[in-house]
Amino acid sequence: MAHQAHAYHMVDPSPWPLTGAVAALLLTSGLAIWFPFNSLILLTLGLVLLLLTMYQWWRDIVREGTFQGHHTPPVQKGLRYGMILFITSEVFFFLGFFWAFYHSSLAPTPELGGCWPPTGIVPLNPFEVPLLNTAVLLASGVTVTWAHHSIMEGERKQAIHSLTLTILLGFYFTFLQAMEYYEAPFTIADGVYGSTFFVATGFHGLHVIIGSTFLAICLLRQIRYHFTSEHHFGFEAAAWYWHFVDVVWLFLYISIYWWGS
């Protein structure tokens, strides 16, 4: 691209939105085929294409923002608004799951035995693994804030250490959640309780994996001297997203694990 003589956001022609859309189509189609037919071909294809798209698109944005200087103050302002709108859309996404949960639990139908949890369902103890998960995510919220303050104050080593700790806590949360799913006394097929529990907590788990990936990219960029104390919006966006994931978990814990049990 030729040098631009203005400060505004002019996007270069890019194939990655298209490949990302194709990857999303393959992933959803692959899931729909995997459940009834136990075939992983389409799902694997979608995952590979998604990973390639993520790598290439992130590389392009890092190049534009870090080395070509395209992320001027007006562009950063636009990116901030974009991230705020994205998180707002995610709030409404999770609102649907909470709506389904409260719709089912506040007025249980006779088919559920007129009670919540439904007859025959043994809920998980909210004061065991779920409480540990809450502590892990709250601790990761503290460490990501520590990383942010370290970057703003130019404390490079502290930023790397705190960011590494945040990512490790994120992966530990994912591991605990996977163990909980494996040992749960009910499944996604166990009526409305099973489906609302696994869909809500499952999508939250997916968001934790996405957030951990986002922070891992930020860690690599911090190691490679991409962030300065004034110019680090990539990290800020990841931190906002991580705090959003934290807050959603608190609502899930209070609603589904504690009150719902």
Swiss-Prot record:
The chain crosses the membrane at residues 16-34, 41-66, 73-105, 129-152, 156-183, 191-223, 233-256. It holds the Pfam family COX3. Its EC number is 7.1.1.9. It is a multi-pass membrane protein. It catalyses: 4 Fe(II)-[cytochrome c] + O2 + 8 H(+)(in) = 4 Fe(III)-[cytochrome c] + 2 H2O + 4 H(+)(out). Residues 35-40, 106-128, 184-190, 257-261 are mitochondrial intermembrane. One of its GO terms (molecular function) is cytochrome-c oxidase activity. It is found in: Mitochondrion inner membrane. Its main location: mitochondrion. It comes from the Eukaryota. Residues 1-15, 67-72, 153-155, 224-232 are mitochondrial matrix. Belongs to the cytochrome c oxidase subunit 3 family. Component of the cytochrome c oxidase, the last enzyme in the mitochondrial electron transport chain which drives oxidative phosphorylation. The respiratory chain contains 3 multisubunit complexes succinate dehydrogenase (complex II, CII), ubiquinol-cytochrome c oxidoreductase (cytochrome b-c1 complex, complex III, CIII) and cytochrome c oxidase (complex IV, CIV), that cooperate to transfer electrons derived from NADH and succinate to molecular oxygen, creating an electrochemical gradient over the inner membrane that drives transmembrane transport and the ATP synthase. This is Cytochrome c oxidase subunit 3. It comes from Tetraodon nigroviridis. The gene is mt-co3.
